[in-house]
Every structure is written in C-alpha cells, then in structure tokens.
Amino acid sequence: MITLYGINNCDTVKKAQKWLTAHSISYTFYDFKKQPLTNELLGQFVELNDWSTLLNKRSTTFRNLSDEIKHNLTDDVIFEQVLAQPTLLKRPLLLIEQDTAQNQQALHLGFKADNYQAIFQ
C-alpha cells in the first residue's frame, strides 16, 4: 500500500502525484488540509524518521512560530506544534508499506524524480 501525504496546493506534492500517475503507480492521497493529522499517524512518521528530517525549518509556518517555541524545540513541543500545524512537515511524505504482517514500512520525504525512480524500480 502506498500513501502520499501532503497538501493539495503544494507544487512539490503536485509533481509527486503527476509522477506517480504517469508511472501507473496506484496510491492514496492524504491531504492534511482535509484530513486531520492524528497522534497515531504522526507517531508512525517519527518512528520511521527523526524530527531533524521531518521538520521543515524553511517553511513559512516554521518561520512564523514564536521565538520562544523555536528555542524550546523538545520532542513534545515539536509533536504538539506539528499536530496543530501539519504544514511544519516536509512534503510530500511517501509511505510505502511493503508487508503489513511484518510491519515493514518506509517513509520517503520530498520529491525528486530520480529518487522516485530508484524507489519504484
């Protein structure tokens, strides 16, 4: 099962969707603007990648955080902020579940055609 997470109006997410469709790869799209980010889902992301790769510090949302929050970025604070503002995550997030019985999953961040080509070869 393949799930692409992001927001529908993000150009990078659109590129990933276009690439997946052009290569006849079926996927489910999870739009953070229409579906809430849950504790469970965010916890799953954190298990697969750490905050240093998940958090988009170049985003407008991050830049708009108060200095107090930016200087107190503990795991709990980040978790709380990302739940409230999922646009703090890098996009898109591509979750591939290879074997649900064995709980084998991979989470890929961002989109580059070469990377997607390597993932799906």
Located regions from the model:
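Thiol/selenol-based redox catalytic cores and closely related redox-interacting motifs
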Residues: 35-121
